[in-house]
Amino acid sequence: MLLVRYLSPPIGAIIFVFEVLKHKRLLVDGWVIAVGSLTSYGVARLLGSTPLAIGSAPTPVLWTFGLVGVLAALCSVLFITLLYGSERFLVRFFPNRALRAVVGGGVVIALGVMNPTALGLGNSTIEELLLFNNAGLWFFISLGVVKLLTTSVTLGSGGSGGIFSPALLIGVAIGGAVGVIAQSPAPVLLVAAMASVVAASVGSPISGALILLEYTQLWEGSGAVAIAVFTATLLMRLLTKETIFTKRLTLLGVDSSSYRVH
């Protein structure tokens, strides 16, 4: 329900759980998820949390959304590879948990010097870029690279953290970079990129798009977002059958299809 608390997408959050898990039991107990999501949304609104509502904005040419989708899929594959690769590397060469945590923390601090905004959840960075996107190409490239590496090292060294927020920041970096190159830094490009990275890396194309559209209220850009998400999802399926979650199950020797709805 933290997703609802920070981004205020009650419907998208419900679909997200069903789309990612596809667990047979959810067909019976799905109402619990719906109640939890809507309750969290209601409490968050009472505490002052609201959707971003960035308003209308010009839509860039369509080829930029196709490019965003391609880059999102490639970065998602890289994200999964780096995440589990860094874990294997650190566990192998630093078997002591305490030492592994120290090494990981040192690497994260060193990487953070390149772009400090890549550290943390990044909610304020995302909102600022959506509302006032005046950053340069180097900022977006360094943001994406540093976030990919710091998230991989943090989780690989035994630290705590999620996947959704890093995926959003990586998406912002992709959308921002494409916007600078195409000389069209529109918010809808960032929204499409965030939705595409979530869709490709987590395996949630429908909820990925819906969550970001609910969050930004940029419904007039839904067609363009759909192009990017479809491109990212299709290319991701061609490149790998794994998502960032199913990869973990595969490494543990668990057949995820045994409890999924087909």
Where are these regions (language model features)?
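Alpha-helical transmembrane segments and immediately membrane-proximal extracytoplasmic
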Residues: 1-262
